[in-house]
Amino acid sequence: TGSGPSLSIVNPLDVLRQRLLLEIARRRMRQSQDQIQANREILQTI
């Protein structure tokens, strides 16, 4: 049971890090999708 407290301290940090990485990945996906959309619009006007 000695590892219980340390686990409860470490886990939230891992969860926070995971959420941060997911958020960064989502933002990158959104940016790339916006870029693709912008490129399509540019190609259509040419």
From Swiss-Prot:
UniProt-recorded name of the protein: Diuretic hormone
Modified residues (Isoleucine amide): 46
Function: Regulation of fluid secretion. Stimulates primary urine secretion by Malpighian tubules and causes a dose-dependent stimulation of cAMP levels in the tubules.
Localization, UniProt: Secreted
GO annotation, cellular component aspect: extracellular region
GO molecular function, one term: hormone activity
Family that this chain belongs to: Belongs to the sauvagine/corticotropin-releasing factor/urotensin I family.
Keywords assigned by UniProt, alphabetized: Amidation, Hormone, Secreted
Pfam families on file: CRF (PF00473)
Protein's organism: Periplaneta americana
InterPro entries: Corticotropin-releasing_fac_CS (IPR018446), CRF (IPR000187)
